[in-house]
Design a protein with these regions (language model features):
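Extreme N-terminal, non-catalytic leader segments
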Residues: 1-45
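Amphipathic alpha-helical transducer elements in NTP-driven molecular machines
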Residues: 32, 77, 126-134, 157, ...
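Residue-level signature of catalytic and energy-coupling elements of molecular machines
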Residues: 35, 46, 72, 80, ...
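Walker A/P-loop phosphate-binding motif and the immediately C-terminal alpha-helix
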Residues: 37-75, 190
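Short glycine/serine/threonine-rich phosphate/pyrophosphate-binding segments
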Residues: 50-56, 77-81, 152-160, 182-185
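Phosphate-binding loop that captures ATP/GTP phosphates
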Residues: 67-69, 73-118, 123, 130
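Phosphate-binding/switch loop-helix module in NTP-utilizing enzymes
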Residues: 115-166
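Conserved catalytic-core segment of NTP-binding enzymes
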Residues: 146-147, 153-214
Length: 214
């Protein structure tokens, strides 16, 4: 076991330090904010279309009359603002960040909404990235959200663990594609959700076929 940092929110060890403690330390929202259901969109593999599926889910629920938000947890590879055609920057008060609102009323928060240029790289270590994800949840003025979709980065690393342990995730949607290699890696994300008792509420096989023109 590595040296303990006493930050149980980013640790998967079941050691004596956390005996009697819940492994899930849910971070509270800002006072006056409300978020109903929270769903993570995950895949062990990159390039399968998680961000596009996240965007389409958000648009669909918004069209059904719900207040919707998207939290872009892919800190080093954010693409949610681009998917919605957003190129501006998020505003802030003295003590909070304001989500960017799309033309159809969907609330967005992504690291690309905080950078001076959307092509600037994010070169941060894992603990800093995890802290940013928590800030996106607890320091943003989310306004009466019925459904929040969290666009997760590929893999089963620090960010996924951080989200599952500090956000009240109601379930995950798994995104895959038909390739055998992708299937093998996606199973890692499935098993992670099962190990952490996060319900799998949907499976999307993206890029499964192409319809040729006549």
């Amino acid at each position: 076991m590595s040296d303990c940092t006493h930050d149980c929110s980013s640790c998967g060890e079941n050691c004596a330090e956390r005996q009697g403690e819940s492994p899930f330390q849910i971070k509270p929202l800002r006072e006056g904010c409300r978020v109903g259901k929270v769903y993570g969109v995950v895949s062990g593999k990159g390039g399968v279309g998680k961000s596009m599926v996240t965007s389409q889910l958000a648009v669909t629920m918004q069209r059904r009359g719900h207040n919707v938000a998207v939290l872009d947890a892919d800190i080093t590879g954010p693409s949610i603002p681009k998917a919605f055609g957003i190129h501006g920057r998020a505003a802030a008060t003295q003590d909070a960040i304001l989500p960017v609102i799309t033309g159809t009323g969907i609330q967005l928060m992504s690291v690309n909404l905080l950078l001076e240029h959307e092509t600037d790289p994010v070169i941060w270590r894992g603990p800093v990235i995890g802290g940013v994800v928590q800030q996106f949840w607890g320091d943003v003025l989310w306004q009466d959200v019925d459904y929040m979709f969290v666009d997760m980065p590929p893999g089963t690393g620090d960010v996924a663990l951080n989200v599952f342990q500090t956000l009240p995730v109601d379930g995950v949607i798994i995104v895959a594609s038909p390739q055998e290699l992708v299937s093998m890696v996606v199973q890692k994300a499935v098993k992670m959700a099962q190990m952490m008792n996060i319900p799998i509420v949907g499976l999307v096989e993206n890029m499964s076929y192409v319809q040729c023109p006549d």
